[in-house]
Regions:
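SMC-family hinge/dimerization module
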Residues: 190-221, 231, 294-316
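Extended, Lys/Arg-enriched charged tracts that mediate electrostatic binding to polyanionic substrates
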Residues: 155-202
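Amphipathic alpha-helical transducer elements in NTP-driven molecular machines
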Residues: 12, 44-47, 65-68, 96, ...
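Conserved amphipathic alpha-helical "coupling/scaffold" segments
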Residues: 1-144, 150, 154, 158, ...
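Non-transmembrane, heptad-repeat alpha-helical coiled-coil rod segments
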Residues: 238-272
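ATPase nucleotide-binding head domains, primarily ABC-like/P-loop NTPase cores
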Residues: 286-289, 294-486
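Long, charged, glycine-rich C-terminal linkers/tails
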Residues: 176-191, 280-303
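Extended, charged coiled-coil "arm/hinge" scaffolds of SMC/Rad50-like chromosome-maintenance ATPases
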Residues: 128-146, 229-250
Length: 486
């Protein structure tokens, strides 16, 4: 199904709203790239998935999910037997945690006997969890930059010795803090060595090693001789600490080498479930219902609402096609909402074919088309110095060359932009071609010749956007069987 036609209906805006209901970067990406399926059984499956997610939300609350990191680069490193950083290990532990919580959510939502009959079981059942590995990583890590002291007994011992040695150094250096030789009464660190700030004129008064000067040269940072050995001991302890951290990171990475494929599957399943539950949350937000998917090539929408118009202002309409007529001609004033009706119809069909619930009353039914074609509004080709009429004709010719008997065609102001008589005759010819090829067509027009043609031709029906004569304003209601006044 070609996205250029869907974009004319503003389907991309629907997907953008849907993506906001997804939580993970994968779910959002899947939502933004959603394309209607033209496989009836697949559409039914997608609708069933949305229905089960809808029920699970009402039964057990929302899926326990937060934004997740992209761990695919981490897994690639593991496949090369690399040692992961603290942050990367923490990222993977978070994925394992979310995976476990997904399983717990599903298990608590379903009776044991229901699990395997669940539509979503095939996704949840593929998710791998390992609390032992998850717990080992979380227990070892303090935050994304540091390990806990208890990550190993050796690390705990080394860090105790570090703190002890640092305190010994500070105790010795504190004796200098009351000295007139210091620029400031503080102990600081230069080149990983504890030093004191000495006034440059007293450099000979404190024996030790100079590790730097202030920008003005008035201060020298001196490591006194009486802490030299302690600073050396501290440096050795820090080297031992780094080596022990490396050993711990290696040990934790070793836990993950054999489960990289499981984690890749987890990411995939988390993204798919995030999308499915996003569909359900979107349905709840717009008070949508599950459409009936029929095989008889008709569409019957009851009190349907445009999904991009606020529910406070949108006027629900009833619209059907395919049972008693194949071509529906919509007429009425330019401000009466004819184009909105076209877009509503196309959007609803596209949404249903993506597994989305539709903003319509229960009992509304949709056919799974092999393609949805639309000629609505002006195209970029107009900017390439084609007239409005020529632009529409280029689009329509492409549509006529591509349609099948299972296609839906939406035409806005067919035949407009040229001589009215020629435009009306051209419109009739195009509609007859589509009718003879058994295509379902919705078209708007302001030509009376087309309205009259629909009145006397089998398979055609008129409809109009109602206009309030007394108040001189459109009501936006659709009246099928009644031609309108343009």
């Amino acid at each position: 199904m070609e996205t250029k036609y869907l974009n004319k209906l503003e389907f991309d805006k629907v997907l953008n709203i849907l993506s906001n209901f997804a939580t993970t970067y994968i779910g959002k990406e899947l939502a933004l790239n959603l394309i209607p399926s033209n496989d009836k059984e697949m559409v039914k499956q997608l609708q069933n998935e949305t229905s089960e997610a809808y029920s699970l939300i009402y039964r057990n609350g929302n899926l326990p999910i937060d934004a997740i990191p992209n761990i695919l680069p981490h897994l690639k490193m593991l496949d090369s037997n690399c040692i992961l950083s603290i942050k990367y290990l923490l990222d993977i532990a978070n994925i394992l945690k979310i995976s476990r919580e997904f399983q717990e959510y599903f298990s608590s939502s379903m009776q044991i006997t229901e699990n395997k009959s669940s539509i979503l079981y095939k996704y949840f059942s593929k998710i791998y969890s390992n609390y032992n590995i998850e717990n080992q990583i979380f227990s070892a890590i303090l935050d994304e930059n540091a390990l806990n002291d208890n990550a190993s007994t050796s690390l705990a011992s080394i860090r105790r010795n570090i703190r002890k040695t640092e305190q010994q150094i500070r105790d010795k250096l504190n004796s200098y803090l009351s000295s007139k030789y210091l620029q400031e009464r503080l102990v600081t660190i230069k080149n990983n060595r504890f030093v004191v700030p000495v006034k440059s004129e007293y450099r000979s008064e404190i024996k030790g090693f100079i590790h730097g000067t202030s920008s003005t040269g008035s201060t020298l940072f001196i490591e006194p001789m009486n802490v030299f050995e302690l600073n050396n001991s501290l440096a050795v302890l820090h080297i031992e600490e780094e080596r022990e951290i490396e050993r711990i990171l290696q040990r934790l990475s070793n836990l993950l080498y054999d489960i990289t494929e499981n984690l890749k599957i987890n990411i995939n399943m988390i993204g798919k479930l995030d999308l499915i539950f996003a569909k359900a949350k979107y349905a709840i937000s717009i008070d949508a219902t599950e459409p009936i998917i029929n095989s008889e090539k008709y569409v019957n929408l009851i009190k349907v609402r445009h999904p991009l118009i606020s529910s406070d202002t949108v006027v629900p309409i009833d619209i059907n096609i395919g049972k008693t007529f194949q071509v529906l001609l919509i007429t009425g004033s330019n401000t009466g909402g004819k184009t909105v009706t076209l877009k509503t119809f196309g959007l609803i069909c596209a949404m249903a074919m993506c597994g989305l619930y539709i903003p319509a009353k229960e009992g509304s039914s949709v056919y799974v088309f092999d393609n949805i074609f639309a000629d609505i509004g002006d195209e970029q080709s107009i900017l390439a110095s084609l007239s409005t009429f020529s632009s529409h004709m280029v689009n329509i010719i492409e549509i006529l060359n591509s349609v099948t008997s299972n296609s839906l065609v939406l035409l806005d102001e067919i035949g407009s932009g040229t001589d009215p008589i020629e435009g009306a005759n051209l419109g009739i010819s195009i509609l007859n071609y589509l009718y003879n090829n058994k295509v379902l067509v919705l078209s708007t027009t302001h030509y009376p010749e087309l309205k009259n043609y629909a009145l006397v031709t089998d398979g055609y029906e008129n409809a109009s956007s109602e206009f309030d004569i007394e108040n001189l304003r459109p009501t936006y209601k659709l009246l099928i069987g009644i031609p309108g006044q343009s």
